[in-house]
Amino acid sequence: VPDSQQKKSIVVLVSGNGSNLQAIIDACAQQKLPANVSAVISNKADAYGLQRAKNANIPAVFLDHSTFTSREDYDRQLLAEISTFSPDLIVLAGFMRILSPDFVAHFEGKMLNIHPSLLPKYKGLHTHQRAIDAGDTEHGVSVHFVTAALDDGPVILQSKVPVFAEQDPEELAQRVQVQERQMYPLVIKWFCQGRLLMKNNKAFLDGNELEVQGYAAD
């Protein structure tokens, strides 16, 4: 089988800068991932992630949520756009919309998200400030399968960073993002190699059910 046919197809959804998208594009280009990014789709016209896609000659699709009357209508159109690329995997990389249950169900077990906290702590926004305000000594990032509840799907991998005294959230965010750019391509690689799957709302790697905090490297 030609190499190109063995590669998995990924569609990445972004709303902003797309630094994780860039890490994924680079990993594919360097043959570190047995995959190709088939398209990048954004709900924001000015998302720099769209420019990153164009720079890499990847189809960049802007789908404006403000022109739809309901979340369900938007998600139906989003589903149609994604389906034209026949992806094996959907990757949320800073996609700042809550997805409707029907959309999530359609891609069950084939959609990943990265969230800047040690889930189940700090679902939602402003995670870095919340970790600092709580006096946490460690913070981090989680990659998880997407389920209908926000930031609630089974965790695949977490990475921790220390929280220093007098820490400001921007600096903490930067250190978390360094971890993100290493972790996300790794988890995507596991998926593309057929090593990672979700069943019964649990994540499995190499046939082994993962712990609540995901794969433990230590």
Where are the regions that the model predicts?
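N-terminal Rossmann-like dinucleotide-binding module
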Residues: 1-48, 52
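Short, basic/aromatic-enriched C-terminal tail that caps enzymatic domains
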Residues: 22, 200-218
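Donor/substrate-binding cores of folate-linked one-carbon enzymes
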Residues: 27, 43, 89, 93-206
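Short, structured coil segments at secondary-structure junctions
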Residues: 56-57, 107
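Short beta->alpha connector loops at strand-helix junctions that form conserved
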Residues: 61-66, 114
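Glycine-rich, highly charged phosphate/nucleotide-binding loops
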Residues: 66-79
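Glycine-rich phosphate-binding loop signature in dinucleotide/nucleotide-binding domains
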Residues: 81-87
